[in-house]
Amino acid sequence: MSLSIIDQLEEKIKQAVETIQLLQLEVEELKEKNNNLTQERDGLRQEHEQLKVEQQNFQERLRSLLGQIDNV
C-alpha cells in the first residue's frame, strides 16, 4: 500500500513539474510581449512628440501668414 502512495505522490510531483514548466514558458512569452509593447509605446510617444512639434510649427506659420494678410 505504501508503494501505491509513493506512485501517487510521484505522479503528482510530475504534474506539478509540468505545470511549473508550462507556467515558466507562459511567463517568458508574457515578458517578451511586454517588451514589445513597451517598445511600441515608446515609439508612439516619440511620434506624438514629433507631431506636437509639427503642429506648433504649422500654427506659427499660419499665425505669421494671417499677420501678413492683416497688414495688407
From Swiss-Prot:
Location(s), subcellular: Cytoplasm
Pfam families given in the database record: ZapB (PF06005)
Coiled coil feature spans: 3-71
Keywords: Cell cycle, Cell division, Coiled coil, Cytoplasm, Septation
GO BP annotations listed: division septum assembly; FtsZ-dependent cytokinesis
Presence of keyword Glycosyltransferase: no
One annotated Gene Ontology cellular component of this protein: cytoplasm
Top-level division of the source organism's lineage: Bacteria
Main location: cytoplasm
HAMAP family the record matches: ZapB
Role summary: Non-essential, abundant cell division factor that is required for proper Z-ring formation. It is recruited early to the divisome by direct interaction with FtsZ, stimulating Z-ring assembly and thereby promoting cell division earlier in the cell cycle. Its recruitment to the Z-ring requires functional FtsA or ZipA.
Subunit and partners: Homodimer. The ends of the coiled-coil dimer bind to each other, forming polymers. Interacts with FtsZ.
Family: Belongs to the ZapB family.
Protein name listed in UniProt: Cell division protein ZapB
Primary gene name: zapB
